[in-house]
Design a protein with these regions (language model features):
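Short, flexible helix-loop junctions that flank or precede catalytic/ligand sites
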Residues: 1-348
Length: 348
């Protein structure tokens, strides 16, 4: 099989990822589980050639110099893929993450209504958080698509690499990728403030300067979407504050309390029928009470504020899990593995 055939096989089998690793057969990840494809082990030269064939000259140069490389790659009429090529003790390797060619709508994702409502804000910061592979990019793409279909504005994305491709509908959309289009997130964000955007999507808020510029953009009249790898709203607030030096923490708390629209922390859970995965969300909305807790550094009290904030569209992860179990979407045993209060779902 060549690389296109392997990727087509992965998509046909609803795999989220394809793994090539010298010394092993190709593997796919389906509904969270790694499975081997019934093929012979691949040699280093096979994997190296497959990866090299789909790289540009600049990407090959980076791979040779840095020993790893991130890029995106499209197979016409199939899908786009986010690729990381790297080296391991048996030889060359690569991980391909499937990016569906169709952007799913918020309705198709069965997203809570508050997801659409929060995109109507004229400015502020919306954070979608969770571990790698939790569907953050899919949720953000659906929110961007909702804006694209309902508002007349300029959406600017800064990604590493570009994942979902958006067509300009009611909005003008400009998508920028680290490497080909800009040298860094901070460079692109500084330039963004002079590019007349209404909405800015930051693929990953990974360092102090990016976070600082995101807060500034949110404060100065832009609706900013960003991601972090944190697992809850409270941990997200802590992570942002902790990045800054002690002398700046109070100022950052004040900025964050003024600009925060929402934190959506999500995880993917296997469905009861075994046919897929469903997103479970913790949702924290920037209400006056939440803003006050951020300003006064009372992060520990956020969980109870979220618990009692359902009228604002808030929910804890456990409240979401209870609803999914009641609707027979997931099994109680599966909910228990993700729950904060595991006793709610009975003994293991």
């Amino acid at each position: 099989m060549d690389i296109t055939e392997l990727l087509a096989f992965a998509v046909k089998n609803k795999a989220s990822d394809l793994h090539l690793s010298a010394g092993l057969p190709p593997l796919i990840r389906v509904h969270g589980d790694i499975r081997r494809i019934n093929l012979p082990p691949m040699e280093h030269e096979d994997v190296h050639a497959m990866v090299y064939d789909i790289m540009s000259d600049a990407q090959r140069k980076m791979y040779e110099e840095m020993l790893e490389c991130d890029f995106s790659f499209a197979v016409p009429n199939l899908a786009r893929f986010r690729v990381n090529a790297f080296n391991q003790h048996r030889g060359a390797a690569a991980a391909f993450r499937t990016i569906p060619s169709k952007v799913l709508s918020l309705e198709e994702l069965n997203a809570p209504k508050v997801f659409a409502e929060m995109t109507n804000r004229p400015r502020g910061l919306i954070l979608v958080t969770g571990p790698t592979g939790s569907g953050k990019s899919t949720t953000l793409a659906a929110m961007v698509d909702y804006v694209n279909q309902s508002e007349y504005g300029h959406i600017l994305t800064i990604e590493d690499p570009i994942e979902f491709l958006h067509e300009s509908k009611k909005c003008l959309i400009n998508q920028r990728e680290l490497g080909p289009h800009t040298l860094s997130f901070p460079n692109a964000l500084r330039a963004a403030l002079r590019e007349d955007p209404d909405y800015i999507l930051i693929g990953e808020m990974r360092d102090l300067e990016t976070i600082r510029l995101a807060l500034t953009a949110a404060e100065t009249g832009h609706l900013v979407f960003g991601t972090l790898h944190t697992s809850s709203a409270a941990k997200t607030i802590d992570r942002i504050i902790d990045v800054f030096p002690a002398a700046e923490k109070d100022m950052v708390r004040a900025m964050l309390s003024e600009s925060l629209v929402a934190v959506i922390s999500q995880t993917l859970i296997k469905t009861k029928d075994g046919q897929g995965r469903v997103a479970a969300h913790e949702i924290m909305i920037g209400t006056p009470a939440i803003r006050n807790l951020i300003r006064e550094n009372k992060v520990a009290q956020m969980y109870s504020a979220i618990q009692t904030g359902q009228s604002f569209g808030m929910q804890t992860l456990d409240q979401c899990l209870i609803d999914l179990v009641r609707r027979n979407v997931i099994a109680p045993s599966e909910a228990r593995t993700r729950a904060v209060s595991k006793e709610i779902f009975g003994a293991a």
